[in-house]
Amino acid sequence: MNKTTLHDQWVVKAPVNDVFEIMTDFEKFPKNFPKVAESIRVNRRVGNYVEMEATVRSFGKRFQVKMNYQILPGKGFISDNDSYQFGTSGHEEMKLCQHPKGTLIDYTYQVTIHNKWLGIIAVPLLRWYSMKYWEKAVIDQLKKILEK
């Protein structure tokens, strides 16, 4: 198994609660962030815990992901994800806090690649490409929605 941690931070010129509302409205992800989410089905919601399945896009492919989210009210979320089809699993954290210019998004994704040979190729590619793609597909889109 190969593991890598991806991390970045961005500032969005909007209040924390506005960012939180969009980033935890999972059912609207396909509409708000079509470059990464094709479809999402919430299977179970109990309090701040959400179990869902999604068809996501990455590296020019579509694949299924099972996600278990813990919503941190007003602060972001923590998620454990399993992409059995792509051969990866991950632990994702998105934390929000006030910033003089709006909201600071602190995003970390710890990825485990279960296929040894895929890991040799994928780890360098993930480190180089993933956060740039996430910024373009999610953060830039979030800014378009909120910074009108």
Task: Give each language-model segment a name.
Residues M1-G47:
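Hydrophobic ligand-binding cavity/cleft-lining segments
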Residues T5-L6, V36-S39, E51, I78-D80, ...:
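Short structured motifs
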Residues L6, V50, Q70, A137-I139, ...:
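A generic structural signal for ordered secondary structure
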Residues A14, G87-G90, K116:
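Residues that form or flank phosphate/diphosphate-binding pockets in enzymes
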Residues V19-M23, F29, M52, Y69, ...:
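Hydrophobic pocket/interface hotspot
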Residues T24, Q64, H91, I120-I121:
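Generic recognition of short, well-ordered alpha-helical segments
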Residues R45, R57-D106, Q110:
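Hydrophobic-ligand binding "helix-grip"
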Residues V111-K148:
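A conserved amphipathic terminal alpha-helix motif
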